[in-house]
Curated annotation (Swiss-Prot):
<comment type="function">
    <text>Cell surface-associated protein implicated in virulence. Promotes bacterial attachment exclusively to the gamma-chain of human fibrinogen. Induces formation of bacterial clumps.</text>
</comment>
<dbReference type="InterPro" id="IPR005877">
    <property type="entry name" value="YSIRK_signal_dom"/>
</dbReference>
<keyword id="KW-0134">Cell wall</keyword>
<feature type="short sequence motif" description="LPXTG sorting signal">
    <location>
        <begin position="992"/>
        <end position="996"/>
    </location>
</feature>
<dbReference type="InterPro" id="IPR050972">
    <property type="entry name" value="SDr-like"/>
</dbReference>
<dbReference type="GO" id="GO:0007155">
    <property type="term" value="P:cell adhesion"/>
</dbReference>
<feature type="compositionally biased region" description="Polar residues">
    <location>
        <begin position="40"/>
        <end position="63"/>
    </location>
</feature>
<dbReference type="InterPro" id="IPR019931">
    <property type="entry name" value="LPXTG_anchor"/>
</dbReference>
<protein>
    <recommendedName>
        <fullName>Clumping factor A</fullName>
    </recommendedName>
</protein>
<feature type="region of interest" description="Disordered">
    <location>
        <begin position="37"/>
        <end position="200"/>
    </location>
</feature>
<feature type="compositionally biased region" description="Acidic residues">
    <location>
        <begin position="547"/>
        <end position="565"/>
    </location>
</feature>
<keyword id="KW-0572">Peptidoglycan-anchor</keyword>
<feature type="compositionally biased region" description="Low complexity">
    <location>
        <begin position="68"/>
        <end position="88"/>
    </location>
</feature>
<feature type="compositionally biased region" description="Polar residues">
    <location>
        <begin position="973"/>
        <end position="982"/>
    </location>
</feature>
<dbReference type="Pfam" id="PF10425">
    <property type="entry name" value="SdrG_C_C"/>
</dbReference>
<dbReference type="Pfam" id="PF04650">
    <property type="entry name" value="YSIRK_signal"/>
</dbReference>
<keyword id="KW-0843">Virulence</keyword>
Length: 1029
């Protein structure tokens, strides 16, 4: 029993195990089938997605799509991180710049600035040619011969400086002679070579650290202190104040400013009354003279008012008794004023302000002290900064080696300026010299104001001698016999009171450079005298006589002695000037011009011109011009032009021309043009043309075109064409065309063509065509073509065509063209043209042109032209063109053409075309064609076409064609899914079934049979076991 139980237990265990295995197998197969369905569903989804995106049937693209998406996500993340890093980096300079800006502002606020300040700098260059200034331009009211020292002399003196240099000067006393020229005036100040890099320009070059001091003595005018009176400054009327100067003042070239004043004196003014003129601290009224005076205000030979300078540098005028007897007194006053070297120590912008009472004038000028003269390692500059005409003394300050270069065995000499009648006395008795050492070149003031307490006095360590009459010599005795820092030499000398000449000095620095070459550099100093003036007048006051004591008594009438010493001056000046001038010029010009002009001109001109011009021009012009011109011109032109032009032109031209032209041309052209054109053209043309052309063309064209064309053409054509063409073309075209065409064509054509073409085409076309064509055609064609074509085209065409064509054409053409063009054009043209043309032309053209043109043109032209032309043309053209064109054209053309053409062309074309075409065609065609064609074509075309065609065709055709076409049909089935299924799947938005399979019933049946078979086997084994028992 136990054994049986055990056996039953074993059998039952075994049966349960078999059932479990079968059930597990069924479940496993079911799960496996479910996974396979999911995988199939995913595969189908990926295939359709890939097909929708790339329109490709390549199975590899199915698996590549998800990888591409993952890669894009990764790239996007990387780009984001990179941009974040760049943003962080970019913020640091901004923060630094903000800090620097704040620091700069803080520094600027410490310097007081008044008025409008403009930062500008000029400088003379460090070359001998530039530093040698001629110091021309005469001062107004210059008195170079006056040497009076009387108390009434109001002349002020300013210094004039100029550098000189020479080489290989063996004799120390030998110097270069430079002729004296007139000193520069205020408005025409001398050397004007400019270089901001050599100028230490500051916004306000005013020394505010030291108290204001005057370099002149006020003792001479203290005795003229006014009598006690009242200040009537604010009672003056009709007050005018002006500052007259150029934008730049050169103090070391006798530069100064004019202070102009005008006013009316109240009738109540009496002797002793005063008024005050404020003078800015940046100016002084003495120049280099030690004693400052201001001019009296004169009324004829009478003094109206006397002026003195107070301790603040302002001017106080005191009225004389002239105002006691005059009414309506008016006065004007002009005073020269000079830049104060103590208060303006550096080159820079300075705002000047002066006034009478509440009426003031302000002006900002650039004070340019100019750079020292330099020749190789030698540098020097000097100035005469003080003249005492009472004591007959002067002071000269010289900067030796201000550049801080290394000068070996330096020697400084001072003499009278050659070829001048200088009044200086140079000897041991009349000349005292002090020498100061400067540790740092930046410690030197550009105005040559020197405070001796700030520098080391080394006078005792140098050797000062007077080797020749009117000459001193300073030898710098250093331990190594060379200097590397600047030195200041101050010369206090005397002038000869009996001399008729002016003060003129020359200072020369000698020394070796590191190559032991002996050179010299000189600097000349002179003075210029400037006068101030004051004038006024008035009307005599009425006098009330004494009344008689008794009635009837009559006072005797005095003789009339009315005296009016007032001075009125008026000047009328007329000038007639005739001038002849000849000019050869090379010009770089940048101009902005607006011009309205009406011009009648007859001109004959011969001109050779080389011109570089950048021009922006707005011009409205109406011009009638008869011009005969011979011109040889080489021109590089970048031109941006907006032009509105109305032109009526009648021209009759007979021209015989032989032309050989070599031209290099690169052209970038942007053109906007609106064009309406009515053209009637009769043309007889005999043309022989040999053309070699390489053309690469990128063309974007939007064209709306309506065309009515009646064409009768007789053409005989023999064409040998080798064509390589690379063309990228995107074209949107709306075309309405009515065409009647009759064509008789005899054509022999040998064509070898390699063509790569990418074309997208959408075309809408309505075409009515009646065509009678007789064509005999022999054609041998070898064609390799890769074509991708997208095209958008809307076309309505009615065509009646009669054509007889005889054509011989040999053409070699290489063309690269990028064209952007917007064209609106209105044109009426009647043209009769007979042209025989032979042309040889080599043309390279570089042109960058942006043109917006609105043009209305009426042109009647009769032209007879015989032309021989050979043309080799390499043309690179970038062109964008938007063209709206309405054209009515009646054309009758007889053309005999021999043409050899080799053409390389690459074409990418996008075209959408909807075409409605009604065509009646009767064609007789005999065609022999040998064609070898290799073509790779990717073409996407949306075409809506309505075509009504009546065609009668008799065709005899012999054709040998070898074709190698690699074209993948767009609708070929793949992976058991045909195009219709794909379309249905694409249009259906419902999700795929969970199983992803269509043989669901078959699978269930198979597994049911397997289960039944397992059950039979199980029951059979049980039965066998029972039988064994």
């Amino acid at each position: 029993m136990n054994m049986k139980k055990q056996e039953k237990h074993a059998i039952r265990k075994k049966s349960i195990g078999v059932a479990s295995v079968l059930v597990g197998t069924l479940i496993g197969f079911g799960l496996l089938s479910s996974k396979e369905a999911d995988a199939s569903e995913n595969s189908m989804t990926q295939t359709e997605n890939t097909s929708n995106e790339s329109k490709s049937n390549d199975p590899s693209s199915v698996n590549a799509a998800p990888k591409t998406d993952n890669t894009n996500v990764s790239d996007s993340n990387t780009t984001t991180n990179t941009n974040s890093d760049e943003t962080n980096v970019a913020q640091n300079p901004a923060q630094q710049e903000t800090t620097q800006s704040a620091s700069t502002n803080a520094t600027t606020e410490e310097t007081p600035v008044t008025g409008e300040v403009t930062t500008t700098a000029t400088n003379q260059a460090n070359t001998p040619a530039t530093t040698q200034s001629s110091n021309t331009n005469a001062e107004e009211s210059v008195n170079q011969t006056s040497n009076e020292t009387t108390s009434n002399d109001t002349n002020t003196v300013s210094s004039v400086n100029s550098p000189q240099n020479s080489t290989n000067a063996e004799n120390v006393s030998t110097t270069q002679d430079i002729s004296t020229e007139a000193t520069p005036s205020n408005n025409e100040s001398a050397p004007q070579s400019t270089d901001a890099s050599n100028k230490d320009v500051v916004n306000q070059a005013v020394n505010t650290s030291a108290p204001r001091m005057r370099a002149f003595s006020l003792a001479a005018v203290a005795a003229d202190a006014p009598a006690a009176g009242k200040d009537i400054t604010n009672q003056l009327t009709n007050v005018t104040v002006g500052i007259d100067s150029g934008d730049t003042v050169y103090p070391h070239q006798a530069g100064y400013v004019k202070l102009n004043y005008g006013f009316s004196v109240p009738n109540e003014a009496v002797q002793g009354d005063t008024f005050k003129i404020t003078v800015p601290k940046e100016l002084n009224l003495n120049g280099v003279t030690s004693t400052a005076k201001v001019p009296p205000i004169m009324a004829g030979d009478q003094v109206l008012a006397n002026g003195v300078i107070d301790s603040d540098g302002n001017v106080i005028y005191t009225f004389t008794d002239y105002v006691n007897t005059k009414d309506d007194v008016k006065a004007t006053l002009t005073m020269p004023a000079y830049i104060d070297p103590e208060n303006v120590t550096k080159t820079g912008n300075v705002t000047l302000a002066t006034g009478i009472g509440s009426t003031t004038a302000n002006k900002t000028v650039l004070v340019d002290y100019e750079k020292y003269g330099k020749f190789y390692n030698l540098s020097i500059k000097g100035t005469i900064d003080q003249i005492d005409k009472t004591n007959n003394t002067y002071r000269q300050t010289i900067y030796v080696n201000p550049s801080g270069d290394n000068v070996i065995a330096p020697v400084l000499t001072g003499n009278l300026k050659p070829n001048t009648d200088s009044n200086a006395l140079i000897d041991a008795q009349n000349t005292s010299i002090k020498v100061y050492k400067v540790d740092n070149a930046s410690d030197l003031s550009e105005s040559y104001y020197v405070n001796p307490d700030n520098f080391e006095d080394v006078t005792d360590s140098v050797n000062i001698t007077f080797p020749n009459p009117n000459q001193y010599k300073v030898e710098f005795n250093t331990p190594d016999d060379q200097i590397t820092t600047p030195y200041i030499v101050v010369v206090n000398g005397h002038i000869d009171p009996n001399s008729k000449g002016d003060l003129a000095l020359r200072s020369t620095l000698y020394g070796y450079n590191s190559n032991i070459i002996w050179r010299s550099m000189s600097w000349d100093n002179e003075v210029a005298f400037n006068n101030g003036s004051g004038s006024g007048d008035g009307i005599d006051k009425p006098v009330v006589p004494e009344q008689p004591d008794e009635p009837g008594e009559i006072e005797p009438i005095p003789e009339d002695s009315d005296s009016d010493p007032g001075s009125d001056s008026g000047s009328d000046s007329g000038s007639d000037s005739n001038s002849d001038s000849g000019s050869d010029s090379g010009s770089d010009s940048t101009s902005d011009s607006g011009s309205d002009s009406a011009s009648d001109s007859d001109s004959a001109s011969d001109s050779d011109s080389a011109s570089d011009s950048d021009s922006a021009s707005d011009s409205d012009s109406a011009s009638d011009s008869d011009s005969a011109s011979d011109s040889d011109s080489a021109s590089d032109s970048d031109s941006t032009s907006d032009s509105d032009s109305t032109s009526d032109s009648d021209s009759a031209s007979d021209s015989d021309s032989d032309s050989d032209s070599d031209s290099d041309s690169d052209s970038d052209s942007d053109s906007d043009s609106d064009s309406d054109s009515d053209s009637d053209s009769d043309s007889d043309s005999d043309s022989d043309s040999d053309s070699d052309s390489d053309s690469d063309s990128d063309s974007d064209s939007d064209s709306d075109s309506e065309s009515d064309s009646d064409s009768d053409s007789d053409s005989d054509s023999d064409s040998d064409s080798d064509s390589d063409s690379d063309s990228d073309s995107v074209s949107d075209s709306d075309s309405d065309s009515d065409s009647d065409s009759e064509s008789d064509s005899d054509s022999d054509s040998d064509s070898d063509s390699d063509s790569d073409s990418d074309s997208e085409s959408d075309s809408d076309s309505d075409s009515d065509s009646d065509s009678d064509s007789d064509s005999d055609s022999d054609s041998d064609s070898d064609s390799d073509s890769d074509s991708d074509s997208d095209s958008d085209s809307d076309s309505d065409s009615d065509s009646d065509s009669d054509s007889d064509s005889d054509s011989d054409s040999d053409s070699d053409s290489d063309s690269e063209s990028d064209s952007d063009s917007d064209s609106d054009s209105d044109s009426d043209s009647d043209s009769d043209s007979d042209s025989d043309s032979d042309s040889d032309s080599d043309s390279d053209l570089d042109s960058d042109s942006d043109s917006d043109s609105d043009s209305d043109s009426d042109s009647d032209s009769d032209s007879d032209s015989d032309s021989d032309s050979d043309s080799d043309s390499d043309l690179d053209s970038d062109s964008d063109s938007d063209s709206d064109s309405d054209s009515d054209s009646d054309s009758a053309s007889d053309s005999d053409s021999d043409s050899d053409s080799d053409s390389d062309s690459e074409s990418d074309s996008d075209s959408d075309s909807d075409s409605d075409s009604d065509s009646d065609s009767a064609s007789d065609s005999d065609s022999d064609s040998d064609s070898a064609s290799d073509s790779d074509s990717d073409s996407t075309s949306d075409t809506g076409s309505d075509n009504d065609s009546d065609s009668e065709s008799d065709s005899n055709s012999d054709s040998d064609s070898g074709s190698n076409n690699n074209v993948v049909p767009p609708n070929s089935p793949k992976s058991g899914t045909n195009a219709s299924n794909k379309n249905e799947a694409k249009e259906s938005k419902e999700p795929l079934p969970d199983t992803g399979s269509e043989d669901e019933a078959n699978t269930s049946l198979i597994w049911g049979l397997l289960a039944s078979l397992g059950s039979l086997l199980l029951f059979r084994r049980k039965k066998e076991n029972k039988d064994k028992k």
